[in-house]
Amino acid sequence: MEGVFCPLLFAYCLLPTFNLKERLESMLIIGELINCTRKKVGAAAAARDVEFFKEIACKQVNAGADMLDVNGGLPGQELEVLPWLVNIVQETVSVPICLDSADPEALRRALPLCKQRAMINSITNEPARIAALLPVLKEFRPKVIALCMGEAGPPNTTEERLANASHLVDLLTSEGFALDDIYVDGCVLPVSTTPEHGKALLDAVGQITARYPGVHASAGVSNVSFGLPLRKLLNETFAVLLMARGLDAGIVDPCDAQLMANIRAAEALLGRDEYCANYLRAFREGKLELPTAA
């Protein structure tokens, strides 16, 4: 079946009661595939398979990634693996890097290697993590993903997400970070365990972007589908729902052609693609022509 964009989803998303932040900028696509917590990727990192990572970096950028998330989380090896991965990625592609680590020493080793301003994924509203990461953030001044998780663990409600977001935004701005450098991640959790997780995040994203004009909203979209069949279908749908609430950065699989086509269509329909330039470019490049089933 040909990939289609569902107008009913947009009708739901754009009800007048929703407080949608008006933006013109397109989505920041952060490629998620260089993640050593994934079995195949971790094995390639353990074997120091340079060609594997060159290929996966190129594939993501060619598919439309604006930035690459790099997770070097091999047990006991992150201090060596993260800088190694940064060097490989930068030798291969020219996009900035999002360093996916909570280890301050690993970040201290990797950040000076970044040729462009990096992003850190992520700081949370946990005192121990703040104490560990804040000195590194202040020294190197990267862009920052502020994950709405506190000492009690992952948030269950919209209100918990808002409380964590407020504390983190206030903390970072008090330390001199511009709102434009802060990407609030409302914490995507699987709907397979708690069906309300999806709606709670949607409401939180809308309220965060309304409360803090200038702050970006990001999400690790694929977490929502964990434990369910046809994960790509859920990821593709959820990304569009989030965009209608104000999401402007996503850690996603850019090699998912349907997801990327949906994002380009959503940008055009939400007024975030001036003169539909990105949509038309994707059309000319054949990126909207999805395979059809026999």
Predicted regions and their residues:
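Active-site mouth loops of central-metabolism enzymes
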Residues: 30-55, 121-124, 151-159, 224-232
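Catalytic beta/alpha-barrel core
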Residues: 69-74, 95-103, 118-128
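Extended, intrinsically disordered, low-complexity segments
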Residues: 27-43, 51-55, 61-63, 252-294
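Catalytic alpha/beta core domains of metabolic enzymes, predominantly
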Residues: 132, 140-277, 283-284
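Short polybasic linear motifs
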Residues: 8, 15
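Glycine-rich, proline-tolerant flexible connector loops at the mouths of alpha/beta enzymes
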Residues: 61-95, 188-198
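Alpha-helix-loop-beta-strand connector modules within alpha/beta enzyme cores
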Residues: 78-115, 202-217
